[in-house]
């Protein structure tokens, strides 16, 4: 639904993905603009759970309009399962409150995750991995269902944990914020670095995401293809992948 990093652009929203198995719908990250896109696929009441990687706005901010839709629009049940890194609820409470009441906690059933935790979310088995990022505690998730695996980095720089996260995944959804080697930091990846991780982890398919709107995705794709010889895509707002097919 959204795949841009840092800010949304005319061609796409910030990070946000709909992961579906059968009739179960998991909203994976909720970056700016993704709630509107989500409603092109499901109603707010059809969202069964939310899974957030970290507390940066381009990955979570649209849980706020989703909250208002549920709280004031009577769109969906109270207590929607909501999984996020430890401390996220405190941030959410700062953004939305009514006379000191943490009304977010009334709409969502928060479950705070730490690295190594494994939770069953509907049909999905979700394992949390600590990523290397800046400013906040950031997790990546390995999501398994019916013998197939989606690995999602959220935001990260190079680290051993991201290789472990991706190991043997059917689909590796990996951030690729940069193209210029001079832009490399310890807190994000380039397309080339994403491809190196994909090759080391022996994933089946690499999907580059979190490109800033200013980048030409064709360049990122070309850079990654020079390193990883498996199938590579760049995430777009309308892209759909059927994992295991």
What does each of the following model-derived ranges do?
Residues 75-80, 88-110:
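Active-site neighborhood of divalent metal-dependent phosphoester bond hydrolases
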